[in-house]
Amino acid sequence: MSATYTDLREKLQSLNRDSPKEVRKRKQPASDTEEEDEAGSEPEAEEEEARKVRSGIRQMRLFSPDECAAIESKIDEVVSRADKGLYQEHTVDRAPLRNKYFFGEGYTYGAQLQRRGPGQERLYPKGEVDEIPGWVHELVIRRLVERRIIPEGFVNSAVINDYQPGGCIVSHVDPIHIFERPIVSVSFFSDSALCFGCKFQFKPIRVSEPVFFLPVRRGSVTVLSGYAADEITHCIRPQDIKERRAVVILRKTRTEAPRLEMKSLSSSYQPERLQGSNRQHILKPKRSHRKADPDAAHRPRILEMDKEENRRSVLLPKQRRRSHFSSENYWRRSHDHVDTYTETGEDEGSPVRKVKMRRH
């Protein structure tokens, strides 16, 4: 009889254990000397990779519990307005255990793309998503400007990701051709973690150990730039979302970022339906606009993973790939902890199928 799991996170833990078949398939070193060389070089490479990731991260605790509660009530209002259908179509993107709310600027990604792969993401035409709510400016952005984390006028894109327990977002790099750096995120409702360099595998679903594990506390601000933003993927694993968690992601779009044109809006409508003010859309219809069912956490296909089923392996551009010791070649565990980051500055195996990641 097959094992029964009460939660997807238990299934992931079970699947991450090596099966005898997988162990037999692993390549054995040709000699004891080769084995010693590999054992000696891999930890050094892991430490170097983790050091590079750390160099691109700043993290600080900025919002008090009372301030968090005030912002969280505003996030609940956003959810309520979306449930009532008060936002534009492309403002809201729903998936099991994860809803996204785009403000200021929205863009195509994942299963919405006609052509998939890095560099294919496009901004929506101006006005296709709702403006950034006033409370985001007043309660969040203003504080970041006052603390000189970002310059005034930097943010023109705000995304709220609302996760339920067991939710996740697969490994990705925020599209470099769409967004300037840094990438700023503020966490609410509960503690979680951000993982760098993980591999996601599907059928069965499993997630590798990260190159670097970064605890993320409620009320904390995380700033990614340099290596951490551009040269390695980041993700949120299902096992790291134990309670509801929301994150406000604040970014600036590039002036030269490609944008969909209204006249080319697509193909899912028949010509006879394009009368009057009806507009075509170049996007595929969204998979679902319904809320996740209560038992969604126990299903094997979760969140954005269902959008990744047919994706090719998406790593970084060729010129940025490393032939050895890259985050996409090894499964690693970080021994670092968030307490090494302060407010004051910069100190602040083998899967069955290819890794499925995407720029996001």
UniProtKB/Swiss-Prot annotation:
InterPro entries: AlkB-like, AlkB-like_sf, ALKBH5. Its EC number is 1.14.11.53. 2-oxoglutarate binds at N161, Y163, H172, H234, R245. Residues 32-48 have a biased composition (Acidic residues). It is an enzyme of class 1 (oxidoreductase). Disulfide bonds join C198-C235. It holds the Pfam family 2OG-FeII_Oxy_2. Keywords: Dioxygenase, Disulfide bond, Iron, Metal-binding, Nucleus, Oxidoreductase. Its main location: nucleus. It comes from the Eukaryota. The active site is at Y107. Residues 264-280 have a biased composition (Polar residues). Residues 7-22, 291-312, 330-340 have a biased composition (Basic and acidic residues). Residues 1-53, 261-360 are annotated as: Disordered. One of its GO terms (molecular function) is oxidative RNA demethylase activity. It catalyses: an N(6)-methyladenosine in mRNA + 2-oxoglutarate + O2 = an adenosine in mRNA + formaldehyde + succinate + CO2. It is found in: Nucleus speckle. Residues 281-290 have a biased composition (Basic residues). One of its GO terms (cellular component) is nucleus. Belongs to the alkB family. PANTHER family: RNA DEMETHYLASE ALKBH5. Monomer. The C-terminal disordered region undergoes liquid-liquid phase separation (LLPS) for the formation of paraspeckle membraneless compartment. Dioxygenase that specifically demethylates N(6)-methyladenosine (m6A) RNA, the most prevalent internal modification of messenger RNA (mRNA) in higher eukaryotes. Demethylates RNA by oxidative demethylation, which requires molecular oxygen, alpha-ketoglutarate and iron. Demethylation of m6A mRNA affects mRNA processing, translation and export. This is RNA demethylase ALKBH5.
